[in-house]
Amino acid sequence: MKLIELTETQYRNYSRIHKEKNYCQTVEYTNLLENKKYNKNYIGLIDDSDNVLGATLILSSNLGIKKGIIPGGFLIDYTNKDLLDTFCKYLKDYLKKSNYVYVSMFPLFRYKVYNNKRVLLQDNSEIVSILNKYNFVATEYTNR
């Protein structure tokens, strides 16, 4: 596996079929913001057969220091913890080599899900642990 910069077409094709798709992770959304003050990068983790296994877009600005935003989180199978861990490792290396000083991310997965009787139905704390391992720090969670 390796992390590469995807073309707009590669990213668009992947983002349209992914189950975690959201408007923040679309080419159209980045085109709106690119004209403002941001540059866009489409990053993907590919296997040996060039299949995209995970991807994200990074909006970056370079006003003295290089900062990035990952809106809507990654387009990845969050239930595959090994894949998420590998993606985070490679992404952190990419960000360091690309001289990013700060990157904020607002993932759209739920931390914990409860029913109306306050019984825990879904616990995604392991995802948070993986993100924390690579110094992605959460500021708030959605519990539903």
Label each region the model flagged:
Residues M1-L6, L53, I127-R144:
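Acyltransferase donor/substrate-recognition loop-hinge adjacent to the catalytic core
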Residues T7-T9, T26, T30, T56, ...:
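Residue-identity detector for threonine
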Residues L120-I127:
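Alpha-helical transmembrane segments in multi-pass membrane proteins
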Residues Y14-H18, L91-L95, L131:
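Hydrophobic, Leu/Ile/Phe/Ala-enriched alpha-helical segments that form helix-helix packing faces
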Residues M1-Y29:
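Short amphipathic alpha-helix that is part of the acyltransferase structural core
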Residues E20-C24, V101, V137:
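A general structural signal for well-ordered secondary-structure junctions
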Residues I4-E8, C88, N124:
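A structural signal for well-ordered alpha-helical scaffolds and beta->alpha junctions
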